[in-house]
Amino acid sequence: MIPGEYQLKSGDIELCVGRKSITINVANKGDRPVQVGSHYHFAESNPALSFDREQAYGYRLAIAAGLAIRFEPGQTREVSLIPYSGLRRLYGFRGEVMGPLDNKPKQESV
């Protein structure tokens, strides 16, 4: 082995094998591009993005870690989402969860 050498297995690496996923359509209704990272809570993404946020609650993009998807102004695209796993606690982002995902607050009707 050479110091710093990579020894990789042959074949493809499959992401999200066996994970439940959903597919939603997302439209950028804004006038600027919006980029969403791989581990961002999709329901809390930029308000210029139009999609079913209720359906996306507790989900993130089903893409490799460190990647992002860019939505150009006026663009509509289909994305796959997978649920957060582990303790399913979120803090930060836009501050809409700040704790366990499974204790989702009820939406107030107006």
Swiss-Prot record:
User: What is an example of a GO molecular function annotated in this UniProt entry?
Assistant: urease activity
Q: In which pathway does it act?
A: Nitrogen metabolism; urea degradation; CO(2) and NH(3) from urea (urease route): step 1/1
- From the UniProt record, give one GO term of the biological process aspect: urea catabolic process
Q: Tell me what reaction this enzyme catalyses.
A: urea + 2 H2O + H(+) = hydrogencarbonate + 2 NH4(+)
Q: Where in the cell is the protein located? A: Cytoplasm
Q: What class of enzyme is it?
A: hydrolase
The EC number of this protein is 3.5.1.5
Which Gene3D superfamilies does the protein's record reference? Urease, beta subunit
- Keywords, alphabetical: Cytoplasm, Hydrolase
Kindly state one GO CC term assigned in the UniProt record.
urease complex
Q: Which family does it belong to?
A: Belongs to the urease beta subunit family.
| Subunit and partners | Heterotrimer of UreA (gamma), UreB (beta) and UreC (alpha) subunits. Three heterotrimers associate to form the active enzyme.
Protein name (database record): Urease subunit beta
